[in-house]
Swiss-Prot record:
Origin superkingdom: Eukaryota
Protein name stated in the entry: Chorion class B protein ERB4
UniProt KW keywords: Repeat, Signal
Keyword Repeat: yes
Species the sequence originates in: Bombyx mori (Silk moth)
Role description: This protein is one of many from the eggshell of the silk moth.
Length: 194
């Protein structure tokens, strides 16, 4: 019996992931009581039947206030911190005696270390000039995803409204530069990319 409940819950989770919508924490920001982003004028007076936020919740910003401080809650950047052990695959060792000035130059792999071991006589001098690159390791540039432009459905005059003469916000021949239904969300989850 418990396996049936688990299968039911997992199936519900997969269905929600497949057919749900991402409206962000504050809805689609178009205001008004007919802010049905989920249905957006597919019928029923052309205003949408989803209610505010497209979920019938009624009101904007229906979540905890602390979520505004979380970068991942509105599609912002995601900070990644990674640490690893020092590389051990490259070693430079010498037991020779050098007299005079010695210069060694080259590039070691990033995240490398340098060490000088040995005894220097009082008349000699030893030193290391070691730098660790420019700090650009791995991903060097991240930009916000811009919304998809020039592919949305526009304002359709009276196609799905209650009467042919009434303007309705629905599917139509118009193409908008802002996305679906003249004020689309573009691409991305949660953040408003207008």
């Amino acid at each position: 019996m418990s396996s049936n409940v688990i299968v039911l819950c997992v199936s519900a989770l997969f269905i929600q992931c497949a057919v749900s919508q991402c409206v962000g924490r504050i809805g689609s920001l178009r205001g008004g009581p007919f802010d049905g982003w989920g249905y957006d004028g597919l019928g029923y007076d052309g205003f949408g039947i989803g209610g505010w936020n497209g979920r019938g919740c009624g009101g904007l910003g229906d979540d905890i206030a602390a979520a505004a401080a979380l970068g991942a809650s509105h599609g912002g950047t995601l900070a990644v911190v990674s640490t690893s052990a020092a590389p051990t695959g490259l070693g430079i060792a010498s037991e020779n005696v050098y007299e005079g000035s010695v210069g060694v130059c080259g590039n070691l792999p990033f995240l490398g270390t340098a060490d000088v071991a040995g005894e220097f006589p009082t008349a000699g001098l030893g030193g290391i000039d070691y730098t660790c690159g420019d700090g650009a390791v791995g991903i060097t540039v991240e930009n916000a995803i811009n919304g998809i432009s020039n592919v949305g459905y526009g304002l359709a005059p009276g196609i799905v409204g209650p009467a042919v003469a009434a303007p309705a916000l629905g599917y139509g021949p118009g193409i908008s530069s802002l996305g679906y239904n003249t004020a689309g969300r573009g691409c991305g989850c949660g953040a408003n990319y207008y």
